[in-house]
Amino acid sequence: MPRTAAAVLAFAGLCLCSVPMMAQFNGLLPSGNVYGGFSYAQLTNVVVQQSYKGWNASFEALPFVRLPRLGLVIDGSGFYRRGETQYNAMGGPRFSTNIGKWRPFVHAMAGIRHLDSSGMVYQPLVIDAGGGVDYKLWFKNFSWRLQGDYMHSKYASAVQNDYRTSTGIVWRF
């Protein structure tokens, strides 16, 4: 019986102490969003520019209390065509603002591209400049995103100027 009473008192004490501890973190945890959607791109596969379909996903953290419109974003995408796959992993800053239900944004990112074309593998650096808009949906914390990007890379002694459009769902936290 004394062990049960001690366990109950310890649990009650832990619960009572956790409420003030949660107040300490209020406002310190970064806010942000997670995005996932469908993507269409005009990409150069070594020499020829072709159409690709695939996916795009990103995670944005808004860690700066004094700069609430500036976020840090990590972006990943994959594009597919018969005999070819292309993946991008990028990161960089994003600037956004809220205008009613709309949230326009611009970003600049850099990262790496992995292109597998008929057994030949290339992994050049890629630079991305783009932007878009989120429209707040009637669901709490959800938005719909339209996004466009220009991606620049160089491999196989040629310069690639690629374009990507994406659309999908955003969850804000």
Predicted regions and their residues:
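Transmembrane beta-barrel architecture of outer-membrane proteins
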Residues: S31-N33, Y52-N56, Q86-M90, V126-D128, ...
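Predominantly the C-terminal beta-signal and adjacent terminal strand-loop region
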Residues: K136-F173
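Solvent-exposed loop/turn segments connecting transmembrane beta-strands
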Residues: T44-K53, F79-Y87, S117-Q123, K154-D162
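Extracytoplasmic loops and strand-loop junctions of Gram-negative outer membrane beta-barrel proteins
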Residues: S39-L43, R113-L115, Y150-H152
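Short glycine/proline- and aromatic-enriched beta-strand/turn motifs that initiate or cap beta-hairpins
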Residues: M22-R66, L72, G76-G78, S166, ...
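Gram-negative (and chloroplast) outer-membrane scaffold detector with strong preference
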Residues: S58-G130, D134-Y135, W144
